[in-house]
């Protein structure tokens, strides 16, 4: 290559040196390499701090040690590459400086052109040989320009070669991050498989023991005597005992009083004619209010609050008092009891409950004794005790 520079005239060498891009791209490349070196140094420092946290921080264990061992080569590689990038920046700047020196040593193309123009003029005017010394001096100057350009090119070539020889090729990273992630994923999958293999027998054993436990409970229940099961109905018996007692007393009283009188029998007689059922006759010759009425699903009132019918105090007492109004002066209860005992052979009179089916035609207005004779009941001050529900 030196021979090439030596054989090229100054017009070509000077034109090549001054016609290029100059040293600007080399200086830009040097700045870029410096920035890359700074980024690589920062990455290496960050990696090193992360590894230090893995090995000396609170999260220390086999996994952290494995990750630190896998990532440690990256720290060395980043440090090496950062140093190489910094060296490349230095060498690029040195190459730019060498080019500038070679450019300064190269003859400007205008000087070469002027020499050639001067030589041509001298040759054209050299009729009698008078311009021979001037032509020789001009040729000597041209040869000096040639030598100067060759020397500049040789020096630039030597400097660029030394700069390039100092640069070392960049090494590849030891392992890719994707490969490291795949290795970690494989290790995690292996740990999950091991844990599943350890837990599965325990779960299967627990599920296998469930039928045995259920069979034992079934056998225990089957061995219990039936009399223990009857104890479950004891609260129901206690609650229904008062109702059963009252029903027995009412049935016994009805048996002692005998068959009902004609008036009560007539009350149970059907009304085939479809005639209107007359109103109740009064006790003692007066009417028993404005007739009987019934309602379904109507709540009672205590003040302004609606309450169930079985609440104590919810049954209006005014119904009985209004229905029994006008019966006269209430009799003496003692005398009434003695009279009932004399008429019934010493048995106290029991008021029979009114039948729902016979609460219509033919019902007498007074009470009947066992012989069918009517009792004349003098008005008494009645007190109605509301019925409370069981439970």
UniProtKB/Swiss-Prot annotation:
BP terms from Gene Ontology: response to host immune response
InterPro entries for this protein: PPE_C, PPE_dom, PPE_sf
Sequence similarity: Belongs to the mycobacterial PPE family.
Record's protein name: Uncharacterized PPE family protein PPE49
Protein species of origin: Mycobacterium tuberculosis (strain CDC 1551 / Oshkosh)
Gene: PPE49
């Amino acid at each position: 290559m030196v021979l090439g520079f030596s054989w090229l005239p100054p017009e070509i060498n000077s034109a090549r040196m001054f016609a290029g891009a100059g040293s600007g791209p080399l200086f830009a490349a040097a700045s870029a390499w410096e920035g890359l070196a700074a980024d690589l140094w920062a990455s290496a420092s960050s990696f090193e701090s992360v590894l230090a946290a893995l090995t000396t921080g609170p999260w220390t264990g086999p996994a952290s040690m494995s990750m630190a061992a896998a990532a440690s080569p990256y720290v060395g590689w980043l440090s090496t590459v950062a140093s190489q990038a910094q060296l490349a920046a230095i060498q690029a700047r040195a190459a730019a400086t060498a080019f500038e020196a070679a450019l300064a040593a190269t003859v400007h193309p205008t000087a070469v052109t002027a020499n050639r123009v001067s030589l041509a003029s001298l040759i054209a005017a050299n009729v009698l040989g008078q311009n021979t010394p001037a032509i020789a001096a001009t040729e000597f100057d041209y040869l000096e320009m040639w030598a100067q350009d060759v020397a500049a090119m040789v020096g630039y070539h030597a400097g660029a070669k030394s700069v390039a020889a100092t640069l070392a090729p960049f090494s590849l990273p030891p392992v890719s991050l994707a490969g490291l992630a795949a290795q970690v994923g494989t290790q995690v999958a292996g740990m999950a498989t091991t844990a599943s293999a350890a837990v599965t027998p325990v779960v299967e054993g627990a599920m296998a023991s469930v039928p045995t436990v259920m069979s034992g409970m079934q056998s225990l229940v089957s061995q219990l005597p039936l009399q223990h099961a009857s104890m479950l109905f004891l609260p129901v018996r206690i609650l229904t005992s008062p109702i059963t007692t009252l029903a027995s007393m009412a049935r016994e009283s009805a048996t002692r009083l005998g068959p009902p009188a004609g008036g009560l029998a007539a009350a149970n007689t059907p009304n085939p004619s479809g005639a209107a059922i007359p109103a109740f006759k009064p006790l003692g010759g007066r009417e028993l209010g404005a007739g009987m009425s019934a309602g379904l699903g109507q709540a009672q009132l205590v003040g302004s609050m609606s309450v169930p019918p079985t609440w104590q105090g919810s049954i209006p007492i005014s119904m009985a008092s209004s229905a029994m109004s006008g019966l006269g002066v209430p009799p003496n209860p003692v005398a009434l009891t003695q009279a009932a005992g004399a008429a019934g052979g010493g048995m106290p009179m029991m008021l029979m409950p009114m039948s729902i089916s016979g609460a219509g035609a033919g019902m007498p207005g007074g009470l009947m004794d066992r012989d069918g004779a009517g009792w004349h009941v003098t008005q008494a001050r009645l007190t109605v005790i509301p019925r409370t529900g069981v439970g």
